[in-house]
Amino acid sequence: MCDNIIKFENVKKIYYLYKNEKEQFSYLFKSKKNIKQHIALNNINFLVNKGESIGIIGKNGAGKSTILKMITGVTFPTEGKVTIIGNVAALLELTAGFVPEMTGRENIYLKSYLTGLSEDRIKEIEDDIVDFADLGEYIDQPIRTYSSGMKARLGFSININIKPDILVIDEALSVGDASFRKKCHEKIISLVESGVTVLYVSHSIDSVLEICTRVIYLKKGNIVYD
């Protein structure tokens, strides 16, 4: 049985830099060879085995976030193939997807349901999510009354407690105050130890070394070290 849970095969991602919307529309029906291009990923190949914890490092614009967005289905390759086996939780845009008029607790059910969890399973983890977010009485107040930090705490808590097969993290450890960041860090390490596959983008080499057992170094859309 194959242990590969993530596979990138000759993956290329091109962003076309149009001058305006009119030009973008005109090129829907003809070749884009004359349009200025930004190659975010250039024929990337790598495999991730179940249970691996991988740090993805590189300068801004190296292609790190593009890889994470492909794993989470936010964007797709221009060429090549990406294969994902298992459910994915993403600590990317932690505050995205909340309904402002719904309470924090109601949003727990909504966001968890959208990840594919059953109502019974959500009930099982509800207390864990509430306790980890540590929002007190605000958990039953509308999200519109939350600060951005409170929304990020709740978003982190939901994604970290659904126990995914694959956890994708993009600098999420900057959430909240020092004590909450420490709690987040410890939770991620416990998930790694339990066998969750983790892909972690960070500018902190110390965090990568503590969490990850493998590092992929990207430069200008290419893997230069794995």
Language-model segments: which ranges?
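Pre-NBD coupling/linker segments of ABC/ABC-like ATPases
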Residues: 2-40
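Conserved ABC ATPase "signature" region
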Residues: 26-27, 121-138
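The feature captures the beta-strand-to-loop junction immediately N-terminal to the Walker
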Residues: 57-59
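H-loop/switch region of ABC-family ATPase nucleotide-binding domains
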Residues: 202-203
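A short, surface-exposed alpha-helical micro-motif characterized by mixed small hydrophobic
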Residues: 208-210
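Conserved ABC ATPase "signature" C-loop
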Residues: 220-221
